[in-house]
């Protein structure tokens, strides 16, 4: 009787090891290197990863790469389920009123339902355009969760910073508006 139990235990152990190896291989194969946030932490100023996503308001798409060389960009990663996103998006909406002629503001609704996101924008008075990144793949390129994540992109397309503390917003806005 002990032999079948031992075989079952060994089989379970082998299955567990094979599963962990498969997970490790998948992780290595799908690791696209350091995200933008990590590169900034390392002192680098990477070129903003390109994306081409549908606007939440249905007015076409936004292709980030095509905006390079025009105006600097503030990129706001948010979701309707994110409570802190309300505060940051309202701060960005106020900043857009001051800097909107010199800086482009773009929201990226991530890991969310587009219908919830549109309702959220209307409810909170957010008027800058947002795109939909339902799978979170664009967010992953920029560093992943947590959100809100707000990045500042110079006119050249280089990412110059990420909002970490409240004081970063006016500082980075002045910096990119002058670029």
Task: Name each region found by the language model.
Residues 74-75, 105, 150:
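Hydrophobic beta-strand anchors of alpha/beta hydrolase catalytic cores
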Residues 87, 95-135, 147:
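Conserved segment of the thioredoxin-like fold in thiol-based oxidoreductases
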Residues 10, 119-127, 132-179:
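Thiol/disulfide oxidoreductase modules built on the thioredoxin-like
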Residues 1-54, 179:
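N-terminal targeting signals for export/organelle localization
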Residues 70-73, 77-81, 146:
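Short pre-active-site segment immediately N-terminal to redox-active cysteine/selenocysteine motifs
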Residues 54, 65, 83, 93, ...:
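Nucleotide phosphate-binding site architecture
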């Amino acid at each position: 009787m002990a032999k079948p139990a031992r075989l079952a235990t060994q089989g379970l152990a082998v299955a567990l090891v094979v599963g962990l190896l498969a997970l490790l291989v998948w992780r290595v194969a799908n690791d696209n290197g350091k995200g933008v946030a990590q590169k900034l932490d390392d002192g680098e100023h990477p070129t903003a990863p390109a994306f081409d996503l549908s606007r939440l308001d249905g007015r076409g798409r936004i292709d980030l790469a095509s905006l390079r060389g025009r105006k600097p960009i503030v990129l706001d990663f948010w979701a309707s389920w994110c409570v802190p996103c309300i505060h940051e998006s309202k701060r960005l909406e106020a900043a857009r009123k001051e800097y909107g002629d010199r800086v482009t503001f773009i929201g990226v609704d991530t890991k969310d339902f587009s219908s919830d996101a549109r309702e959220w924008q209307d409810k909170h008075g957010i008027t800058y355009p947002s795109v939909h990144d339902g799978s979170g793949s664009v967010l992953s390129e920029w560093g992943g969760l947590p959100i809100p994540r707000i990045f500042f992109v110079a006119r050249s397309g280089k990412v110059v910073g990420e909002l970490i503390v409240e004081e970063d917003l006016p500082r980075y806005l002045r910096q990119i508006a002058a670029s």
